[in-house]
């Protein structure tokens, strides 16, 4: 029950790890420990990095400083074509690079073509095999300049890329292509979309690919990186021996204007009208030139200021919503990289119906307020403290950085000459800059950004009559923004002086149980609540809290479902007690405190964490959240208005409408599974929200809470009895029982073909099985191997051999609670005329697996990675990790069983014991007597319209 809460509480701050690395730089003398870099006479740059953290494995990368932007008008799409061809025949791998990798159980490889560059990677290569690692170097060497580009490979990849083009087709690509001219001001970036046009993909010639490859894939535009558990000296010798064979020929100099985007003084304007637009909205986009080789202090400040902006600026919209003054359904703003040397600030808004112009004025008013007044010292300093704590936590983390992090540092060094520095030194440099910053610094930076230069305004709608904000209306609003300044203002926030200003009667601990294995205690309170407490000084001044109960949607009677849905959506949207959300946000500033509620299908939960110094604030806030939850009538009315608006404007044509029909076919509407339509939303009763909240959170006796961290027992008892013990609770009420939420149709077989308008000729196929048989641990493992085996076989046959699809997805799910259930689904896209053939092959390959007609190599390729992962999970666990102990306490709360960290980590390997017979048996078991679904969505054929590509 606690699993989702635990994940929220104790997740590794990877965003911090990624963010705090890449724009922080240090002097050249602080080069990373374990790094060897150099440059060969032919111009190839190399990086070898071993910091000792990636034991037993290495990652191999090629970075090619050529992307779609380098293509001329007769080459658009060829950079991406080359990426595909790279996994086919090369000088030293005539049977294909992909075949070689997969034959050696190397299944984690990738390539990415962007507008500015192309990247290749082979991951998790075992370093104990010296010959295999040398062969990885030869693969990189061939990618540099040894791809064969054979006619048969070109035609194979042409078919696959056309399927990829169709796979990506849809309103999102139409939107991206349509707005590119205003976002990029008609520069080269506006016309280079990486994949190219369908016409060009059908017609390009082998010689064109060769010419592009020979021209641009040269050592002076490439670097390789080997990162992991490798010997620096030996690897460097091997690199020199292998890569000296590359031709010593330079790629032509790149005209700096290729990547230049000209300024536009006046705003650019575009209306994007498409019947598949999901909601009427508008966006304001502003482009900035941010040089990658700017002075170090400028780069560090840009990075830190961007993090501040992306955290604090969106809160202005939240404050308007909290004050009930918003003219929008949704609004957001962000600052992020656009293309090389450019950033973009994006303001996007979905207005309430009939309030389009007011919403625009409000967005511009918020923008002007940030420009003219900036952030307050209070909000800046609170965020500064959080950012500082985050950086310090990252410095203390083990395994600082990942191979991909290191690759990005090498990229900066290669492109801009920025010294590659030790991760910890870089973060320390960031901290030095952060502590010196004041609110005036970021406000001056914002004022310099929020000009009217390089703007683009775009409206999005289904029809020309919708969202009809003209260019003149936008420009008029932009000029009149000072007059609309009050639209960005919220009412003065009255500070909270004492969160709980009334007496509460503390509870008592009426029973205490020693949990010896867990070294914890279980307290039963007089209101029936149970609290499992563990002292963990390794939490270093923090504590973690989680509470859960059987509940969620599964306990809601059909007649109350609408009220429940609304209550769930409006949790914490109207504040608590006598405080609104803006007051609470102000009160929370500077407090190292997090608290959230969750309502899942089968459970109700609460969770959070805080510094021990803020423990009283945390538990006082928890008490109000659980006992004084507010539901505002005005917030409720806007929720109903917003829901009805979104329902009325839902897509009624195209793929979205078809998907809605499919859902109703597979999961028919019933009282327990109602359609969320106009009648549903109009049936919601405002008074029902409080009743539903009380039903789920109003009886503390239904909950078991866990409290773990650096908080002494006496203090923990004081907090628990005062705040949790004072909650309403009645242990005499029976524990709640869930009902399975299975709304699938009872029909054993459903086969249906739908048709819809489509401009890409792409058909969708979904084949699935659903069964309700119990699986042992071994059978569950066999199911995972079966899924991987199927996906591999479908990839080999449907994509590589038959060229019927770009990708095939196979999913398998097994759940044991509240009832046993397993499902298997296969999803792919193909052209209309290939539907029958693709379906036939899907069933044929599945039948082959059930009959054990697959090779031992295919079995091992699917099983071995899972077996290796299983061995890795058996590594010793960190007994100081709060998430480990929360998980163990959760096991006890749910089962009554006490497990030690050693016992929880101990497990008998399963995957390595599996046989091909086990895979065939489980495939047969889950599909025999299962409910089967075969859903096909085909494009409509119009006379004279070509659909078979």
Which residue stretches match the model-derived regions?
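Flexible, low-complexity linker/tail segments at the boundary of structured domains
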Residues: 217, 697-698
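Peptidyl-prolyl cis-trans isomerase
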Residues: 146-154, 437-441, 445, 630-636, ...
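Bacterial N-terminal signal peptides
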Residues: 13-24
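Hydrophobic, small-residue-rich alpha-helical packing segments that form membrane-like cores
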Residues: 158-166, 171-208, 212-221, 227, ...
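N-terminal secretory signal peptides that target proteins for export/translocation
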Residues: 1-9
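M16 family metallopeptidases and their MPP-like homologs
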Residues: 49, 54-71, 77-81, 96-142, ...
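Proteolytic maturation boundary segments
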Residues: 30-45, 231-299, 303, 310, ...
